[in-house]
Amino acid sequence: MTSAPTLFDVPQPVPPFKTQLLKWIGNKQRFAHEIASYFPDDVGTYFEPFLGSGAVLGTYAPRKGLGSDALKPLSEIWATLSHDAEELKQWYSARRSLVDADFSNKEEVYEKVKASYNNSPNGADLLYISRSCYGGVVRFRQADHFLSTPCGVHKPIPVESFNRRVDIWSERVKGAVFAHLDYRDAMQEARKGDLVYCDPPYTDTQAILYGAQKFVLGDLFAEIERCKSRGVRVALSIDGTKKSGLKEIIHAAPEGLFETEVMVNCGRSMLRRFQMGGATLESEVVADRLLLTY
């Protein structure tokens, strides 16, 4: 495996796009353009099977793409953005408009929306929760998938600001379609000349948060190997050096599966900050690895 310079040391053909639609754990919006700079120039269809906040897809703005996620309400948000952006605006407006001008009932509104979601999981409630919860950490209990994240300390963005973001994003993702799929089913659709970008839920601490879905890294490596055998290029973002207390997590990829490795400096760990109750994290620095099969 060859080691490339850090993403910050190379020219960036993909311009930055810093406008977030969703607040979501693991969001790579700040440096998504640097990740996309390592994508091939001749991509057929772009696949992103762990869509999350859609930061990389939105930044890359593929001519043709499939964005998918195992969390159905999240997939509903993206599908609605694609086929009816005005409805997405209405989802947010209907909930945000319940908040008083002085924000005195902000937490009450949030808890009401959260209760509605837990009673019947849906994209409309999840959209507001993602913009309003603490740190963008949409946390689920593994036992019953109950969404348990508390209300954030920040003020949810105004309806007008959110609507502008929807307009910007709907234009950037117009080449993509969105679906509720297991990552394996999505990756099996990729063909020679296509590109799959994977940003799976982090193991260790984050695995218990993201949609409460079970995830085995070895299974993903096996699917990547099958993609590579068909001529599909795969780019994988994964923990390179993540400090959780005194523990340092380093994953070793199967020999020969990846041909290029890039270290990405992601700054402070948002997840760890949430767990430490807002404490500053001078030693909690995350360095992702970007692994490429090409």
Please place each PLM-identified region on the residue numbering.
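A broad, low-specificity signal for short, low-complexity segments enriched in glycine/proline
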Residues: 8-9, 24-29, 138-142, 154-161, ...
